[in-house]
């Protein structure tokens, strides 16, 4: 069963953080690429620490080995300097899909005792 094998690596472009630049009086969208560099099909889900300010589209999906997806990370308008942005980040969570599963994302892959991995991408806001 796929769950007994730890999920392999993914790559993100950018690799370590996402940067948004002022002004923040309008919505910004930044694209990141997620690449499945493992030899197994994975299911991925994206979480944000601030759902009011940050959005990701598509928020989840399935990637075959070596397949990539472009995600749109959006930052809604906000009052820069008046809101706490120190802990803002998005987290990519991924797991191997069960053998024989259809290429359609299932939330239950992340429930139970299956192994999942995470990669945090902090958000930096330039004034």
UniProtKB/Swiss-Prot annotation:
Gene giving rise to this polypeptide: msp-77
Biological source species: Caenorhabditis elegans
Protein origin, superkingdom: Eukaryota
SUPFAM superfamilies cross-referenced by the UniProt entry: PapD-like
Gene3D superfamilies in UniProt: Immunoglobulins (2.60.40.10)
Tissue: Sperm.
One annotated Gene Ontology cellular component of this protein: cytoplasm
Record has Cytoplasm as a keyword: yes
Primary residence: other
Misc: Around 30 MSP isoforms may exist in C.elegans.
Keywords per UniProt: Acetylation, Cell projection, Cytoplasm, Cytoskeleton
Name used for this protein in its record: Major sperm protein 77/79
Pfam families per record: Motile_Sperm
PANTHER family (UniProt xref): MAJOR SPERM PROTEIN (PTHR22920), MSP DOMAIN-CONTAINING PROTEIN-RELATED (PTHR22920:SF7)
Known role: Central component in molecular interactions underlying sperm crawling. Forms an extensive filament system that extends from sperm villipoda, along the leading edge of the pseudopod.
MSP domain sequence ranges: 9-126
Positions of modified residues (N-acetylalanine): 2
Location relative to the cell: Cell projection, Pseudopodium; Cytoplasm, Cytoskeleton
Gene Ontology biological process terms from the UniProt entry: oocyte maturation; positive regulation of MAPK cascade; positive regulation of smooth muscle contraction
